[in-house]
């Protein structure tokens, strides 16, 4: 229930932040918007780099191979037990 209520609130807050300052605040909108977009673009680029590095580490690690081997060994053990019992 909390998630159901918090998602609309989060969307409204995000829209208010992205909307920028109102005209009464007197900040030049073009400079403010471009700096906000630059920050957002920089954040996106940083996030992309981190995600790529994360997946690269997973591909290079031996965790997938170990997991695959464990499943294969477990499946073989189950097959052997079924052959013995039948």
Swiss-Prot record:
Source organism (scientific name): Saimiri boliviensis boliviensis (Bolivian squirrel monkey)
Enumerate the UniProt keywords alphabetically.
Lipid transport, Secreted, Signal, Transport, VLDL
This chain's function reads: Inhibitor of lipoprotein binding to the low density lipoprotein (LDL) receptor, LDL receptor-related protein, and very low density lipoprotein (VLDL) receptor. Associates with high density lipoproteins (HDL) and the triacylglycerol-rich lipoproteins in the plasma and makes up about 10% of the protein of the VLDL and 2% of that of HDL. Appears to interfere directly with fatty acid uptake and is also the major plasma inhibitor of cholesteryl ester transfer protein (CETP). Binds free fatty acids and reduces their intracellular esterification.
Q: Which family does the entry's similarity section mention?
A: Belongs to the apolipoprotein C1 family.
Q: Which residues form the signal peptide?
A: 1-26
Query: Pfam families annotated for this entry?
Result: ApoC-I
What else is noted? Apolipoprotein C-I is present in acidic (APOC1A) and basic (APOC1B) forms in P.paniscus, P.abelii and P.troglodytes and perhaps also in baboons and macaques. The two genes for ApoC-I arose through a duplication process that occurred after the divergence of New World monkeys from the human lineage. In human, the acidic form has become a pseudogene sometime between the divergence of bonobos and chimpanzees from the human lineage and the appearance of the Denisovans. Pseudogenization resulted when the codon for the penultimate amino acid in the signal sequence was changed to a stop codon.
Name of encoding gene: APOC1
Q: Please state what the protein is called.
A: Apolipoprotein C-I
Q: Which InterPro entries match?
A: ApoC-1_sf, ApoC-I
User: Per its UniProt entry, which superkingdom is the organism in?
Assistant: Eukaryota
Q: Does the keyword Secreted apply?
A: yes
Compartments in which it is found: Secreted
Provide the GO MF annotations for this entry: fatty acid binding; phospholipase inhibitor activity
> Example GO biological process term?
triglyceride metabolic process
**What does UniProt give as GO cellular component?**
high-density lipoprotein particle; very-low-density lipoprotein particle
